[in-house]
Amino acid sequence: MHQFTHINTNGEANMVDVSIKQDTIRTASAEAFVTMNSETLQMIISGNHHKGDVFATARIAGIQAAKRTWELIPLCHPLLLSKIEIQLEVLTATNQVRIESLCKLSGKTGVEMEALTAVSVAALTIYDMCKAVQKDILIENIRLLHKSGGKSGDFNAA
């Protein structure tokens, strides 16, 4: 079984020392789903939302969140991300928006937390912009889809 890397021998939380690791290409993608009623979704799609372009705002929020993950998650390293991509897909059959992120860099540590933070904040932004018209919007199934690079190898969600 793997050990927690952020816990020292005394059981205290510490940032992992990555100084001796070699730079490798690292990528990660994550997804989240935002479920709402059909009227709210149509308001977003049609561009009739009084706060403006919900998807553009969510996309920018996700990008900004990935860049600032190290400020939000206490033991994350500040990273020089080389790529952040946010895709939003409307699933009209289920009244959902699927958000997918892709983060990439050449560095000493992975970008999983950046990918997860990106979709989380993009989803929260959709909620924030739509809460005036619907308060019971559901954010769910936030998960890592893929990661590559580093000594732990690749991961692909089932």
UniProtKB/Swiss-Prot annotation:
It catalyses: (8S)-3',8-cyclo-7,8-dihydroguanosine 5'-triphosphate = cyclic pyranopterin phosphate + diphosphate. Gene3D superfamilies: Molybdopterin cofactor biosynthesis C (MoaC) domain. InterPro entries: MoaC (IPR023045), MoaC_bact/euk (IPR047594), MoaC_sf (IPR036522), MoCo_biosynth_MoaA/MoaC (IPR050105), Mopterin_CF_biosynth-C_dom (IPR002820). It comes from the Bacteria. GO terms for biological process: Mo-molybdopterin cofactor biosynthetic process. The keyword Lyase applies. Keywords: Lyase, Molybdenum cofactor biosynthesis. CDD domains: MoaC_PE (cd01420). Belongs to the MoaC family. Catalyzes the conversion of (8S)-3',8-cyclo-7,8-dihydroguanosine 5'-triphosphate to cyclic pyranopterin monophosphate (cPMP). This is Cyclic pyranopterin monophosphate synthase.
